[in-house]
């Protein structure tokens, strides 16, 4: 189902092209929250806590919990849930209903981030008495980071750490957060962001030094505290960076800009359905409108509430689009 595509604004003349071979990281369990009910916590309080976590995954850490629509939903959070079960270890496993959440967040006018997230590739070392060592994906600290990433809706992945990786990335490269080597080594993976992490200390007092590259932005910081808390704070920081760049702003009817999408290589119903599915996830209030079909090229009109930069990022996230020059059309021959 490979096809090339380009997008062109009705006024600005923007064009992009890509091959559909590297999809975005789709969080399959985005609408499921697991948490432990504390001894001093009632079941209703635990359900409200899970609902806040779910709302933050979709609408960011700064979601307005006092907005009337959200506050009312938090009074009876069970109405947003499709299933409540008990997992291993006594944890609550709560499955939320996407449509019910969507209605509440739409009423509150919150910016939203869907299940398609930019993948973040983690290069990490553990500091020990004998020096730094690469963090194995199955090490206890790595499993803690994976759990925290799932809890906060972050699409975290680990490199293979094979000979090709090790020829470019050493423990020192990760500790120094050397962007040239790390970004070069990350090119072989379908990730949008690169994270360098140095983890040290004990479970009771962990220190995490992190650096994130996401698109053209670069952030770094240090987090200290108990291991579980530090991992959660790190994932909240990463989630905030993802949300800032990829969240789709709310817009009233009539505030959407209109864009024209030129798609080449649509060679069947499957490719066309995939394209429409991607466009529907852009946060539009209207269905994409088919303008024309010529051979294997279709032209659709879409409305989008964000900026040109946000639209380009969202399309690139789903279809790995890259900006290109708009093709120059040959002039029509003058009649003789």
Regions picked out by a protein language model, each given a short descriptive name:
Residues 1-11:
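Bacterial N-terminal signal peptides that target proteins for export
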Residues 19-22:
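N-terminal signal peptide c-region/cleavage motif recognized by signal peptidases
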Residues 28-36, 186-233, 312, 333:
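Amphipathic beta-strand/beta-sheet edge segments enriched in Tyr/Trp
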Residues 30-70, 178, 230-234, 270-282:
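Short, well-ordered alpha-helical segments
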Residues 49-66, 122-175, 275-299, 316-317:
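N-terminal segment of the mature soluble domain
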Residues 65-126, 134-140:
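Signal peptide-directed extracytoplasmic domains
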Residues 76-87, 157-160, 174-209, 292, ...:
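A short, hydrophobic beta-strand-centered structural micro-motif
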Residues 224-227, 255-336:
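C-terminal soluble interaction/assembly domains
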